[in-house]
Amino acid sequence: MRRSLSYLVSFVVACGAAAQETGQPAHTFVIPSGVKWGAPPPVFEKGMSFTVVSGDPGKPGLYVVRAKMPAGYKIAPHWHPTDEHVTVLSGTFALGMGEKFDKSSMTSFPVGGYALLPADMRHFALAKTATTIQIHGQGPFALMYVNPADDPSKRAPAK
């Protein structure tokens, strides 16, 4: 029994040392009240609040972000070069597939709903109510609009 306990303690200590040597964080905790919301990336219309939970969506590697949208917030048809995993944290979020925004073809996701959108799949979205979603995927994150005129980052600034 003592020998088993000794092996277990040695294993745990070795794992902790290995985690420190790699420079990787041992864990990440996120408490909702501690989340700092800010402006979204420029490829999204104004009105959305955005936060990075883990990783760096602008670099290769895993990332987790959250987006908070008011009721009626739309995301025009677009696609991503990597898979996108979406989980609804609050509200009702709707997704549709295709190159044209068609509200009648959308599927509504309540709290806890999940969608996997494979790389290059054309899709669009609507916050049916005030909604918060969590997105995770493999960076770098990129969003390409089917119609380039829908991309707010490409528009001339309002005067």
Where does each model-flagged region fall?
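Divalent metal-coordination and catalytic microenvironments
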Residues: V53, G112, I133
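Double-stranded beta-helix
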Residues: T28, S104-T107, F124-K159
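Short beta-strand His + acidic residue motifs that chelate non-heme Fe in jelly-roll/DSBH
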Residues: I75-P77, L95-G96, L117, R122-K128
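Positively charged n-region of N-terminal signal peptides that target proteins for export
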Residues: M1-S4
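Glycine- and acidic-residue-biased ligand/ion/polar-headgroup-sensing regions
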Residues: P70-Y73, H80-K100
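A short, N-terminal "cap"/entry segment at the start of jelly-roll beta-barrel domains
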Residues: Q20-G61, P148-K159
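Short acidic-glycine-tyrosine-enriched beta hairpin
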Residues: D56-G58, E99-D120
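Bacterial N-terminal signal peptides
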Residues: S6-G16
